[in-house]
Design a protein with these regions (language model features):
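Extracytoplasmic
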Residues: 13, 24-28, 62, 78-82, ...
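Surface-exposed strand-loop junctions at beta-sheet edges and helix termini
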Residues: 5-8, 12-13, 32-38, 68-71, ...
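A short, hydrophobic beta-strand micro-motif
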Residues: 20, 42-56, 93-109, 162-167
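Beta-strand/loop subdomains of soluble extracytoplasmic proteins
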Residues: 26-27, 34-83, 107, 121-127
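Short alpha-helical boundary/capping segments at helix-coil junctions
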Residues: 125-188
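Sequence-composition feature that favors extended, apolar/low-complexity stretches
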Residues: 110-118
């Protein structure tokens, strides 16, 4: 029972709603997409979404999800086009939640992408730490592209084959502020 419309001892009339019953086993995810992306919606195949209450990114593919419909236009009351999915909920997603949705299409060939955990942001400037040798890292500014919620496309600033820090980025960032010269952290 999601909500009760009447209390104990209340009088009711014929046709009056007494309670709202909901199920949370199969849920519907509705993404509202700006009209400026209307031409790209035909390529959408699935989605990932991030919940605000646990910060976790869920994959519809891993939850038995499927695309139900892509709107042909807005409904006249909003400037957004609906894209609707259905998925199996094991109880971890709260029905009615507002989530951040990442629409997915076919993979792009020759695209360089890194885990979101590898990217740092300082005053709107995005960077990754590139490993030069086992004890030396350099902070490199990058230009970001599309994201699927777990990885982000790198448009500029990084080349294929370079080794980056994807875990422990905060520690490397803090070490860069210490002024220690890599390889010379001992006392003289």
């Amino acid at each position: 029972v999601k909500s009760l419309s009447v209390g104990e001892g209340d009088y009711v009339t014929v046709g009056q709603s007494l309670a709202t019953v909901s199920q949370n086993r199969k849920l519907v995810l509705r993404a509202e997409v700006s009209q400026k992306y209307a031409g790209r919606l035909r390529a959408v195949t699935s989605a990932n979404f991030e919940t605000p209450y646990d910060g976790r990114v869920y994959s519809l593919a891993e939850m038995g999800g499927r695309l139900l419909s892509v709107g042909k236009g807005s409904d006249g009351t909003s400037a957004y086009i609906p894209v609707t999915f259905e998925f199996n909920n094991g109880g971890e997603v709260i029905p009615g939640s507002f989530v951040e949705v990442f629409l997915l299409s076919a993979p792009r060939p020759e695209t360089l992408a890194v885990p979101l955990s590898a990217v740092t942001e300082d005053q709107g400037v995005y960077s990754v730490f590139v490993q030069l040798d086992p004890e030396t890292y350099v902070k490199r500014e990058v230009k970001l592209g599309a994201s699927d919620g777990t990885r982000v496309q790198i448009l500029e600033g990084l080349s294929s084959g370079e080794t980056i820090v994807s875990r422990g980025v905060a520690q490397v960032k803090m070490a860069s502020f210490s002024g220690a010269i890599p390889g010379h952290t001992h006392s003289h």
